[in-house]
Amino acid sequence: MIKDERWEGVYSFEDSPYLMETLTDLRKISTENISFRKGLVRLGRYMGYELTKTMEFEKMPIQTPLEKTEGVFAKDRKNVVIITILRAAFPLMEGLIKNFESAKVGIVSASRGHAPDFKIEMNYIKVPQLNPEDTVIVSDPMIATGSTLIHVLKEFRDSKPKRMMIVGVLAAPEGINAVKKEFSDVEIFVTKIDENLNKDGYIVPGLGDAGDRAFGEPFKVPMLPQMHNLE
């Protein structure tokens, strides 16, 4: 795990050959949906393991079959809330939760519109009660403009959990700048920080639309005729 000196509390995993190989597979246009999902799960599991190294542990006495000794209790690991942004973050969350089996899970449906305004729509939020001792992990594969994450984080600003983290696959400097400007104390962990955004707000070189690549392009539901009130 590498601390990026451009920001406070921003880390990447560019020093991990395993994660870089997995990311390479995700970037390839030839990678199919199921392989893409499995790759996101692997990244989430590895990064979740690395996150445990940043958490507080307490020493505790234990009794083995042979004698008394000293063990550790991962206090913070028991107070984790993982907030998943639909839909691309599901595989990432699946990997993360393998390291935090006691974690509570929140779901947020949020989407970003197209350039130039990149309007954010949030139409579903179901998140457990947050407490001062909680570590909140927001999973979102792509930190592009940062606007979606900012909208999500604003929903929980007043809860004042112990720590707030963002875990993603790729980030653009523009997105990190935007998030850190609004939430300076939020920690960001990503597999790699890419070059920049293109005019359409996509990370380049990037990996495309993570949701579409993980689950397939969405079906275009036709607008239903307006239902009349039958009462």
UniProtKB/Swiss-Prot annotation:
Cofactor: binding details: Binds 1 Mg(2+) ion per subunit. The magnesium is bound as Mg-PRPP.
Q: Which cofactor does it need?
A: Mg(2+)
Keyword Protein transport attributed = no
* Originating organism: Methanococcus maripaludis (strain C5 / ATCC BAA-1333)
Name the UniProt record assigns to this protein: Uracil phosphoribosyltransferase
- Tell me the protein family, please: Belongs to the UPRTase family.
Task: Briefly state the protein's biological role.
Answer: Catalyzes the conversion of uracil and 5-phospho-alpha-D-ribose 1-diphosphate (PRPP) to UMP and diphosphate.
Known HAMAP family for this protein? Upp_A (MF_01218_A)
Organism lineage string: Archaea, Methanobacteriati, Methanobacteriota, Methanomada group, Methanococci
Q: Quick one: which residues bind GTP?
A: 38-42
Gene that encodes it? upp
